[in-house]
């Protein structure tokens, strides 16, 4: 907007020469790309009952439109619940649910050419007119061939082309339900026989007509199914013995779990737009896999109470799982003591109304994935003289794989004060996770590359606090109730495992990665340490610079992904038939490496690259940029070297620490305004028992983020979508894990109107 004229992608061409046109900004070009999404929910429910039966059936439909063009999702659901009483000894209940979820196009995520935001959030300057790209994305030449109209083709496609021609459809059908038969021979003994089924099948079809990665087309089709069957037999006891009360159960469970997946595809097509295996150019992609596992379990639980003042509970469970050779047993114990019942003198209506102490200890075991404990052979697609070939696995079968173990103990206190207007619940817990199943490298002389072993020990300790108070309480007037939830968890990696190749204890285990930044579990550190290129510091803690540029090294610890604490603060106000409430969420800490911030700074599309006359005066670290930090040369001199802004930001991404931001935030999570219709009005209808109307909003505002979050990215919208077809049902992109962000979609603010009527 300073009077420049430059040849541009959409400038007229005269005699083969692209002409210069005004170099001007396109106001709101990013804002105009997004559209107002919508979600419409419709539910109809019917219920009927007699003295021996009760039934409820419901139908629901949800229609959603995305905030980007040509994205949608529809959800259909049916549910039936019925209960029958044959006589005083026998009851029967049944529940069945069916859900279908489908979409013609789910948007891609992450650093991926299927993500339309990759181009917009990293490469599009303000000069790009998105309206022009929208109007011409399907432009063809005189031969009817697509021109792939775009302002530049070096790294990305026109985002409207991506959303309209490179689509990801999804269709899933799920059925789940259970049925139970109850037999009650006495008033204190009951038996239950229960069967439950959960099944789904889904299809995900990803197609690329053209993009930078696949100029000759691409497709993947995955058909996946899962079936889980559970059968339980349980005996319940509920018996009082004078001042003592016993509640208990004992049961057995049979579980069968199966998954299957079939996939086809091609990385290149012979004929454009024909997404079939027969049209694959070269060897097509095929996948056919399945998993089966079964388990048998016995379990029991007993709770004993004395005079409604003291309680003790014990639970035991033993599992035999097909994925682990040996059975595993895990118990738990807990107890609570209501002091105000034991010592009534403690109760004072004006101060203390209720006081309870509680504590518990538990051990939990978990098995592993199928086929890890034994050797198995994989099919080779080719054959030899008509004979099917198999190959030996590269993973050495473990000799004695044990289940993972989690041991936890907890103590807590609950209190009601000031005529039950103040409620406090506080707890401290300690958790140790050990025998984690990890994939460790082995010497190549064994003929294998790795093996699964039991290793690792992680300790967690934390505090959870809830404080709720009726600040103003007036049954006939204004009321105000506020609730604060606060939680802090501190983790520590105590040990990993001894490397079978080197014989040395391992001090770091990679969890995830994004570009050159890796997330490690490191011994002695909290879970999730980001490692990458980072600053070199002087002895006094200042950052070392040379010629105005920070000196950096690889392999530096540049972040901790674990938040320091989380909090939520809710308020509910009511006055007669009106009520209003809102919820604030707060997170402190939790570092995130942002690819958006790295490349958005390199290309100059982020606001901070042009603030403070940096373009005109250059970047002087510590003076007009990153003024919260101190930069010094090796001889201790304060940095005063101005670096050309274009040169500085072009190399911004090479120092990964510059793109790590503190994930702290304050959010207005939700709010609602409700009106309850008075009974005096409803009585006139003679059929409506209750009715209310509510205006609701969710994810309403990101009120504050840490100053290091210069791209103002929602820390909760970080993308972790993977290539797994079931994961990819909601997002496509690379799976970088916790602590990474790449081209994430801006958070969506939603508003809704709810009408509830009870007949």
Question: What positions do the PLM features span?
Answer:
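Short Pro/Gly-enriched beta-strand edge/turn motifs at strand-loop
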Residues: 23-29, 284, 550-554
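Conserved small-residue
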Residues: 1-21, 453, 470-561, 592, ...
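Extracellular/periplasmic, surface-exposed regions of secreted and cell-surface proteins
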Residues: 11, 40, 75-77, 81-90, ...
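Extracytoplasmic gating/loop element in the C-terminal half of outer-membrane beta-barrel translocons
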Residues: 17-19, 30, 321, 589-687, ...
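Residues embedded in well-ordered regular secondary structure
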Residues: 1-69, 106-112, 120, 127-130, ...
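Flexible, solvent-exposed loop segments that connect beta-strands
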Residues: 20-22, 213-216
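Predominantly transmembrane beta-strands of Gram-negative outer membrane beta-barrel pores used
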Residues: 33-34, 41-63, 67, 79-85, ...
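Glycine-rich, aromatic-lined ligand/substrate-binding cores of catalytic
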Residues: 560-595
């Amino acid at each position: 907007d300073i009077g420049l004229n430059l040849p541009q992608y959409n400038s007229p061409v005269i005699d083969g020469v692209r002409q210069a046109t005004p170099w001007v900004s396109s106001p709101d070009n990013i804002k105009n790309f997004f559209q107002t999404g919508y979600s419409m929910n419709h539910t109809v429910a019917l219920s009927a009952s007699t003295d021996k039966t009760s039934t409820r059936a419901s139908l629901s439909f949800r229609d959603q439109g995305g905030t980007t063009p040509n994205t949608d999702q529809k959800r259909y659901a049916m549910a039936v619940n019925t209960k029958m009483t044959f006589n005083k000894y026998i009851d029967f209940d049944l529940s069945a649910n069916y859900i279908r979820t489908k979409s013609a196009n789910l948007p891609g995520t992450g650093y991926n050419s299927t993500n339309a935001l990759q181009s917009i959030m990293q490469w599009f300057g303000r000069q790009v007119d998105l309206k022009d790209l929208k109007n011409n994305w399907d432009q063809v030449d005189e031969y009817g061939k697509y021109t792939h109209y775009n302002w530049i083709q070096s790294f990305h496609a026109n985002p409207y082309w991506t959303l309209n021609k490179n689509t990801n459809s999804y269709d899933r059908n799920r059925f789940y339900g259970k049925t139970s038969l109850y037999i009650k021979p006495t008033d204190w003994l009951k038996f239950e026989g229960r069967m439950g089924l959960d099944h789904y099948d889904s299809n995900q079809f990803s197609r690329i007509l053209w993009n930078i990665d696949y100029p000759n087309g691409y497709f993947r089709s995955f058909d996946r199914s899962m079936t889980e069957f559970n059968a339980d037999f349980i005996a319940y006891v509920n018996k009082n013995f004078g001042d003592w009360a016993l509640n208990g159960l004992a049961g057995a469970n049979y579980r069968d779990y199966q998954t299957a997946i079939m996939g086809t595809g091609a990385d290149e097509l012979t004929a454009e737009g024909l997404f079939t295996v027969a049209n694959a150019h070269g060897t097509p992609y095929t996948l056919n896999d399945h998993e089966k596992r079964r388990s048998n379990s016995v379990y029991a639980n007993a709770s004993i109470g004395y005079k409604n003042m003291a309680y003790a509970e014990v639970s035991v469970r033993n599992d035999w799982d097909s994925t682990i050779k040996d059975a595993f047993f895990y118990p738990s114990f807990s107890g609570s003591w209501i002091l105000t019942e034991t010592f009534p003198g403690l109760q004072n209506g004006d101060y203390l109304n209720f006081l309870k102490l509680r504590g518990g200890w538990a051990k939990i075991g978990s098995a592993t994935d199928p086929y890890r404990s034994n050797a198995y052979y994989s099919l080779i697609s080719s054959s030899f003289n008509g004979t099917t070939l198999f190959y030996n696995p590269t993973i050495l079968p473990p000799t004695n794989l044990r289940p993972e173990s989690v041991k936890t103990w907890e103590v807590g206190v609950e209190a009601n004060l000031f005529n039950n207007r103040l409620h406090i619940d506080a707890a401290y817990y300690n958790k140790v996770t050990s025998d984690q199943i990890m994939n460790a490298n082995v010497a190549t002389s064994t003929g294998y590359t790795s093996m699964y072993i039991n290793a690792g020990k992680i300790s967690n300790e934390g505090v959870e606090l809830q404080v709720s108070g009726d600040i103003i309480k007036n049954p006939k007037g204004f009321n105000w109730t506020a609730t604060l939830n606060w939680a802090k968890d501190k983790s520590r990696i105590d040990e990993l495992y001894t490397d079978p190749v080197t014989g040395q204890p391992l001090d770091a285990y990679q969890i995830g990665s994004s570009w050159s930044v890796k997330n490690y579990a490191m011994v002695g550190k909290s879970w999730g340490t980001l490692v990458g290129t980072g600053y070199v510091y002087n002895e006094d803690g200042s950052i070392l610079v040379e010629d105005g540029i920070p000196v950096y090294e690889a392999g530096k610890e540049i972040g901790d992904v674990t938040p320091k604490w989380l909090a939520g603060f809710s308020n509910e106000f009511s006055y007669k038939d009106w009520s209003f409430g809102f919820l604030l969420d707060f997170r402190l800490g939790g570092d995130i490496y942002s690819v958006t911030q790295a490349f958005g700074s390199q290309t100059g599309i982020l606001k901070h690259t042009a603030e403070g006359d940096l373009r005109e005066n250059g970047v002087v670290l510590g003076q007009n940029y990153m003024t919260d930090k101190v930069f010094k040369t090796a001889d201790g001199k304060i940095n005063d070297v101005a670096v050309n802004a274009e040169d500085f930001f072009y190399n911004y991404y090479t120092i990964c620490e510059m793109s790590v931001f503190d994930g702290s935030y304050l959010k207005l999570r939700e709010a609602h305004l409700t009106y309850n219709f008075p009974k005096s009005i409803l009585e006139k209808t003679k059929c409506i028992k209750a009715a209310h109307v509510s205006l609701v909003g969710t994810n309403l505002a990101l009120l504050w983020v840490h100053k290091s979050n210069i791209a103002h990215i929602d820390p909760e919208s970080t993308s972790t979508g993977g290539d797994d077809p079931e994961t990819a049902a909601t997002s496509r992109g690379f799976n970088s894990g916790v602590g990474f962000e790449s081209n994430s979609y801006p958070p969506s603010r939603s508003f809704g109107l709810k009408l509830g009527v009870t007949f």
